[in-house]
Amino acid sequence: MVKIIGISGGSGSGKTTIVNKISEVISEFVLISQDNYYKSVGDYEYEFLDVNFDHPDAFDNNLFYKQLKKLKENQSINMPLYDFINHKRRDETIKIVPTPIIIVEGIMIFVEERVRNLIDLKIYIDTPNDIRFIRRLERDMSKRGRTLESVIEQYLRTTRAGYYRFIEPTKEYADLIIPEGGHNDKALYVLSSFLKTLVKDSSKFF
């Protein structure tokens, strides 16, 4: 039976760090990023758009749920790919064949109850605001074609408020909260030990 591990936290919280840690324990898994399920917003320059990317409605939540459910049922999907430079969904998709363990990561994967119910292990990465902002700034400028001014404007306009309104409250649904941006050795040890046992016999937990 397919098991889903969900990793959430604010933008720049260190979700990739945890995915890399999991990869040291689990050799075969599929990674699903909620970012690929953003809705297309057209071909205009980002600075001229009044779009809130830090709101649950920015995602195609129905498609995200349906595809995650299919993977849970051991069915393949054609996952969308999102172009962050042009802010629209690409024409091509990528075929995802389910593995026994699937990792799904994203800032709002714990917001909807129907999605939470599909996730067997929920991990929340708790990271100080300044660290998250610096990480997001570096990522968006180096990988997403953003300017310093646009990242700061978005953070002040929607990102900060969206985190406190939608993301941080979902900590209550987490099975494990990892502090310090994913660099807490004791928490990572607990996670690694759990995953090793999970790989051997998932029936002990689910």
From Swiss-Prot:
GO cellular component assignments: cytoplasm
Family membership: Belongs to the uridine kinase family.
Catalyses which reaction(s): uridine + ATP = UMP + ADP + H(+); cytidine + ATP = CMP + ADP + H(+)
This protein's pathway: Pyrimidine metabolism; CTP biosynthesis via salvage pathway; CTP from cytidine: step 1/3; Pyrimidine metabolism; UMP biosynthesis via salvage pathway; UMP from uridine: step 1/1
Organism of provenance: Borrelia duttonii (strain Ly)
Protein name per Swiss-Prot or TrEMBL: Uridine kinase
Residues binding ATP: 9-16
Primary location group: cytoplasm
